[in-house]
């Protein structure tokens, strides 16, 4: 059974950002030479998420508003977690909603998102 493990690191300039990693994952699938199988993409940080959806700026803004409505960053003291000296309780909650990992089929050596 063929497999490939790789780690990608991303640095963003803002507290929250949407990064389209699909091109990076496609390159890794090609590098793996796997023709049929599964691709697991896991956000290896406790406040990072991975999800599949349209890479469209309006949708990103909708996510921003929706997530901030669910778990607003401020006031910081509304969260018990932030009493530990951190200020990222909202990021932990937002990550729970957005998800930790995705699995995508590999068909004919390419990511298969369906028709």
Task: Please give the residue ranges for each predicted region.
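Active-site histidine-anchored catalytic micro-motif
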Residues: 1-115
């Amino acid at each position: 059974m063929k497999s490939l493990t790789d780690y990608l690191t991303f640095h963003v300039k803002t507290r929250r950002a949407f990064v389209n990693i699909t091109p990076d994952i496609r390159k890794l699938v090609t590098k793996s030479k796997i023709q049929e199988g599964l691709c697991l993409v896991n956000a290896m940080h406790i406040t990072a998420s991975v999800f599949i959806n349209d890479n469209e700026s309006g949708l990103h803004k909708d996510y921003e508003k929706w997530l901030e409505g669910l778990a607003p960053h401020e006031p910081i003291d509304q969260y018990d977690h932030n009493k530990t000296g951190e200020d990222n309780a909202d990021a932990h909650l937002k990550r729970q909603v957005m998800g930790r990992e995705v699995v995508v089929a590999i068909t004919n050596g390419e990511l298969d998102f369906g028709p």
